[in-house]
Amino acid sequence: MTLRGLYAITDSQLLAGRFLSHVEAALEGGVCLLQYRDKSDDAGRRLREAEGLKKLCERYGTQLIINDDAELAARLGVGVHLGQTDGPLTPARALLGRQAIIGSTCHASLELAEQAASEGASYVAFGRFFNSVTKPGAPAASLELLEQARARVKLPIAVIGGITLDNAAPLVAHGADLLAVIHGLFGADSAQEVTRRARAFNALFAS
């Protein structure tokens, strides 16, 4: 499968009271990958929300991945995204199988990306590229890093960190395969605006 386009990431606080409606609005606009990201300890709610997302993703033909929780991903039969503090990638690959999508956070490090590739990652994620609401203290990444990664890492490259429709085009031009977006997508005031933004992000890959 080709990993290229909009990579939507949920935020349970940002989407409070409109979780499934705004996610479905994004899916209507076109989402390549949807990541369920919830850092709470409410395992029951996380399972219910993830199950709801899986049903939506199946309806729209979108791949669902879970942030930081390989066991929940295995329970649902979906992929996982692992940060640098979430444990090694190899056990997750063994748990989820060869076909599962597994992503790895690499911050601004080509070495981490090459290590992730050697351990069986499906894609690598660099960032933050701009000021991030979700992770304001994350290491800064650059367009030069993106170009170097494009030459050295033979995997799809996701970019994250403060990405909006106003600043995303240069990232695609310099080799990004996936635009990972939270607030720039789900911060919209209406479901219709979420759909419009999703379509606009995807249009950047068509030009």
UniProtKB/Swiss-Prot annotation:
Binds 1 Mg(2+) ion per subunit. Its EC number is 2.5.1.3. The keyword Hydrolase does not apply. Pathway: Cofactor biosynthesis; thiamine diphosphate biosynthesis; thiamine phosphate from 4-amino-2-methyl-5-diphosphomethylpyrimidine and 4-methyl-5-(2-phosphoethyl)-thiazole: step 1/1. The keyword Metal-binding applies. GO terms for biological process: thiamine biosynthetic process; thiamine diphosphate biosynthetic process. 4-amino-2-methyl-5-(diphosphooxymethyl)pyrimidine binds at Q35, Y36, R37, D38, K39, N67, T105, K135. NCBIfam families: thiE. Belongs to the thiamine-phosphate synthase family. This is Thiamine-phosphate synthase. It comes from Pseudomonas entomophila (strain L48).
